Amino acid sequence: MGDSSALVNRPKRRKMAIGADIGTYNLIVCKRDDAGSFSYKKEVNAFLELPLENRFVFNMMKQAGVPLIERDNIAYALGDAAVNMAYTMNSLELKRPMVAGCVNPKEKDAFQIMSIMIHSLIGEVSQDKELLYYSVPANAINEETDADYHGKILEAILRSYRSEKGFSVDPRPINEALAIIYAELAHKSYTGISASFGGGMVNVCYAMFGNPIFSFSIVNSGDWIDKMAAKAVGESPTFINKEKTKIDLTKPATTLVERAIQTQYRLMIEHTVTEIKKGFANVQKNIRTEDQVDFVVAGGTASPNGFKEMLGECLKQADIPVNIGQIIKPEDNLYSVAKGCLLAAENAK
């Protein structure tokens, strides 16, 4: 990545740039529209395998607008359509090109399927080698992960992109949680804590003036909630994933499913806060801050009502060795990472 203080030092932005949040559950691309506003395109990073025994069904699905590709006599339904089909038909297994924040080594078609979806989201570019910053996780502290290898796989996917005019992109990685600080903490001189609660990982960063002081990830986030809550109530993770979008963490649970989801949310947040406390303990000799430190949360798993309040409770109980200021959940928190990637690209040297 380029100089991480670039956003502070270079107020003029690059005219053409792209930001890409390549997450375990969501793929999001951010560009500027003609008016200079942020414009987003999103797809779910998932697919279904459908044997092509009945060509009529395949053709009907295609006519209905289901994104489909065909390979080796197998049809693949992509994105949101795949999730909806898996939810309505329990016999279908939803497959994921990424798991725990990284490319899924068990899915042999992950590279090709992700390439198709990401290239489609990028759409057309206006010049050759258009600068594109894409999100990568930090290495996990609770499982063995290889963020560098994952970043190279994503780089290869992006370098294989070609527009209709033959234009390419120039991909560069940026830490996912640092991108949130670029997106949401300009008013605090890019100083604060950020946590991206995605599908596969929680990514955390503490930065001062745009420079990361510590960062880490935890392989226990949205998918983990789905898996553990499903196990507790005897449902499928796909069912829990749908129910999770309806949960309100400010209200007492009234069903077994709600109780399981709320319990797993609290466990995930408590674990994250414990590791943040350790992060500050490890660097406290090298930093000195008496000011309040704002905390930004983003990502789809942070979307439920009451998430911010539950995080605040856990932070108070943990007695973090810094003065926590505002807990900020942006209105468009699902898009914060992609927005930060775009801002980094626009201000790169």
Question: What kind of region is each of these model predictions?
Answer:
Residues 1-68, 73-194, 209-218, 222, ...:
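Nucleotide/phosphate-binding catalytic cleft detector across ATP-hydrolyzing
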Residues 203-205:
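A structural feature that tracks compact, well-ordered secondary-structure segments
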